[in-house]
């Protein structure tokens, strides 16, 4: 079991501990539960889906990286496929506050980058901030997404974001988590190709500035993040954050990164290079390359 889970695991009910122990035994537990695993946990504990998600939140929050606030938030995004995806907030010392990742963004990106097609619900241990409510409104499930909070009845996003402004107001038809392929040819080595593939999945209807980041760890594992724009602009999630979300949730740490590649267009209206390289250097990665989409 990864050390970060030990304290939270010890506080779980005995029957949930017993059912989870073989799942968490792998140090690189992928921070997700398949539909089959969810069904097995429900049977072992007698909990329904909502109660089980609440019971698992401490494990999601244990994935938080909060050296600045020490305020750990956990989220579990429930995919329409039946898979549940953990998420947690992340802060980066030496970077800027704008680089921060919120738990809801983490869980949603985890699902999206794992190939999930849409979300049915998200469970969070604290009320989503306005930034996250706006981020969720970009999803293809948008205002119908169910939000579950401890001690409250579940409500749809539309109840938390009345009179919402979103992509439909800008006549955007393709939404976050819809399948997209921008068709750029995969060239270069495996890491460069992973970055280009991530850029091809970008959701960037506002700036038309595709980008993707791929991180290679010392053991050869590659984590890729795609750019995710938002109708309100500021809640946009950069591609580096997507890759760092996966790196963290899958049990790796920043010192494990040995090389990074950013893929973007040289003449794009928005450029990721400066922010990407500055944040990576703050995390200790100095081997950073850029490949140009053509």
From Swiss-Prot:
Binding residues for substrate: 89-91
The record's free-text note on cofactor binding: Binds 1 zinc ion.
Annotated positions binding Zn(2+): 102, 129, 132
GO annotation (BP), single: cytidine deamination
Catalytic residues (positions): 104 (proton donor)
Alphabetical list of CDD domains matching this protein: cytidine_deaminase
Transmembrane segments annotated in the record for this chain: none
Catalyses which reaction(s): cytidine + H2O + H(+) = uridine + NH4(+); 2'-deoxycytidine + H2O + H(+) = 2'-deoxyuridine + NH4(+)
Assigned keywords, A-Z: Hydrolase, Metal-binding, Zinc
GO molecular function: cytidine deaminase activity; identical protein binding; zinc ion binding
EC number(s) per entry: 3.5.4.5
Annotated CMP/dCMP-type deaminase domain residues: 48-168, 186-294
Pfam families tied to this protein: dCMP_cyt_deam_1, dCMP_cyt_deam_2
GO cellular component, one term: cytosol
Cofactor(s) listed in the protein's UniProt record: Zn(2+)
The organism's place on the tree of life at top rank: Bacteria
Function recorded in the entry: This enzyme scavenges exogenous and endogenous cytidine and 2'-deoxycytidine for UMP synthesis.
PANTHER family tied to this protein: CYTIDINE DEAMINASE
HAMAP family in alphabetical order: Cyt_deam
Family: Belongs to the cytidine and deoxycytidylate deaminase family.
Subunit structure: Homodimer.
Protein known as: Cytidine deaminase
